[in-house]
Swiss-Prot record:
Location of the protein in the cell: Cytoplasm
HAMAP family in alphabetical order: EF_Tu_A
Enzyme Commission no: 3.6.5.3
Gene Ontology cellular-component annotations: cytoplasm
Domain tr-type G residues, every copy: 5-223
Function: GTP hydrolase that promotes the GTP-dependent binding of aminoacyl-tRNA to the A-site of ribosomes during protein biosynthesis.
Protein name: Elongation factor 1-alpha
Length: 424
């Protein structure tokens, strides 16, 4: 039986090499989720490969390719319990070209740990900003900042360096709209302040990282909204049948339900539901599930389709109006521009058909009607036409399916939310 404690999806974000995977490995190890002999095995292997401090990180970096490169590519999920919560940990990649995965991952998070290295010359960096901003735009409501590598400051465990990094991070996070933020000085590699108070930082009187996680609030589950499950993957399992996998964003799914997948437009009956290999009689928002559907073949549906009930089907649009912020475009964006929109698990090329107006980012008032173009830092209302059918919802109705990121040339050029739509 799955744990009776409230369940939170927790993502670790931050700049590459600031120690996210090592911290996650440490958390899981100290919770007994990983036996000591496995860590010892990883330590020997890491030493042989010339990556002596990587053993904890390798817990999450399951893929061989990641071990060789020392970077996290796909999203790895692991679970652990605290006194108060049952957490599924999502370790998000830090390298630039992996921001896409980070986007699809962040939209599943109830809370985030932002990892920032306190080592000299590290601190708040470009990727720290981008990840924090994406977390905000994609609706991650609460965050704890782990100021990591305190063992590597000069002198080690320097209160002065902690306060510098904390001040920079606080300024950044407040400017993008985070309110409740706690800061914890830690060493993921040495274990300081992760689950136990550190004797090396007597100047710090606050909670350990674990206590800070337990101070998170449980987001109210949107169980009264229509069912929406964006499909992450589809399996065909011998003797069972077609099994889509995804996270319930809104609503409730039970065995026996009649469901429809859109835009694929395929219907079926739910036979059974599983989470972490255990059967569920009811799946609720936040649950990462696999569910067996009768009447649908594996090739009928794919990643990016959304499952809903027949009487309240997901909304397929032919056009939508969005509020976007331009984050990182090398020149300007004009009508006719066609990047890829990442909405829940879907990735669809969309044309920016019209720039309706630009807004003042501080108060949302109109700056200019129908400008010719928009550039970095601009907030704008735009009309968007997808190349092919796409499920997206108004952010005012189902925010979980109303937010998106815009990618082009290997980077996130903009992020935004759907404020109005034209049904197909």
């Amino acid at each position: 039986m799955a744990s009776q404690k409230p369940h939170l999806n927790l993502i670790t974000i931050g700049h590459v090499d600031h120690g996210k995977s090592t911290l996650v490995g440490r958390l899981l190890y100290e919770h007994g989720e990983i036996p000591a002999h496995i860590i010892e095995e990883y330590r020997k292997e890491a030493e042989q490969k010339g990556k002596a401090t990587f053993e904890f990180a390798w817990v999450m970096d399951r893929f061989k390719e990641e071990r060789e490169r020392g970077v996290t590519i796909d999203l790895a999920h692991r679970k652990f319990e605290t006194d108060k919560y049952y957490f599924t940990l999502i370790d998000a990649p830090g390298h630039r070209d992996f921001v896409k995965n980070m986007i699809t991952g962040t939209s599943q998070a109830d809370a985030a740990i932002l990892v920032i290295s306190a080592r000299e010359g590290e601190g708040v960096m470009e990727q720290t900003r981008e990840h924090a901003f994406l977390a905000r735009t994609l609706g991650v409501p609460q965050m704890v900042v782990a100021i990591n590598k305190m063992d590597a400051t000069s002198p080690p465990y320097s209160e002065k360096r902690y306060n510098e990094v904390k001040a920079d991070a606080e300024k950044l996070l407040r400017s993008i709209g985070f309110k409740d933020i706690s800061f914890v000085p830690i060493s993921g590699y040495k274990g300081d302040n992760v689950t136990k108070p550190s004797p090396n930082m007597p100047w710090y009187k606050g909670p350990t990282l674990l206590q800070a996680l337990d101070a998170f609030k449980v987001p109210e589950k949107p169980i009264n909204k229509p069912l929406r499950i964006p499909v992450e993957d589809v399996y065909s399992i011998t003797g069972i049948g077609t099994v889509p996998v995804g996270r319930v964003e809104t609503g409730v799914l039970k065995p026996g339900d009649k469901v429809i997948f859109l835009p694929a437009d395929k219907q079926g009956d739910v036979k059974s539901i599983e989470m972490h290999h255990e059967p569920l009689q009811q799946a609720e928002p936040g649950d990462n599930i696999g569910f067996n559907v009768r009447g649908i073949a594996k090739n009928d549906i794919k990643r990016g389709d959304v499952c809903g009930h027949l009487d309240t089907p997901p909304t397929v649009v032919k056009a939508f109006t969005a509020q976007i912020i331009v984050l990182n475009h090398p020149s300007v964006i004009a009508p006719g521009y066609k990047p890829v929109f990442h909405v829940h698990t879907a990735q669809v090329a969309c044309r920016i058909d019209e720039i309706v107006k630009t807004l003042n980012p501080k108060d949302g008032t109109t700056l200019k009607e129908k400008p010719d173009f928009i550039k970095n830092g601009d907030v704008a209302i735009v009309k968007v036409i997808p190349d092919k059918p796409l499920v997206i919802e108004k952010v005012s109705e189902i925010p979980q399916l109303g937010r998106f990121a815009v990618r082009d040339m290997g980077q996130t050029v903009a992020a935004g939310q759907c404020i109005d739509l034209e049904k197909r």
